[in-house]
């Protein structure tokens, strides 16, 4: 059996890093003593929460070309020792005779940035798969541990989903739900 584990929202804190890099390159002018308002990011539709005058094209350029290493490579872990927990889960899955697969939707420069992220935190995994679309993750696994709402919503009936609870996926259905790895 092939058991997949996604990266964003499970191991990597993509949202927090995206927000800080966005604020760095798209600063808002504030009055003296005024603080940046807290964003309530309750979906993964980044255009709902961050302004890009060029829409999806500008967002994709920012994510996958201009700021990939900063966002994907230098993001923190979702929880302390998430990558170590990934390593332990990977070994457990292998010991049980199954195939663990780390799987992520990545494009362009986010691929090497993601490999850097995994490397710098000492991920000891054997199989890493990059896909271009969220629903394509299901083609590589029988069971998938993910926090991504689109991936959860596109689950085929014969597959099993395990949702890692996050503020942007609370309303998504899954076969099983966990707090973290």
What is each stretch, according to the model?
Residues 143-180:
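Acidic, Mg2+-coordinating phosphoryl-transfer loop and its flanking beta/alpha structural elements
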Residues 103-155:
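Substrate-recognition "cap/lid" segment bordering the active-site pocket of phosphatases
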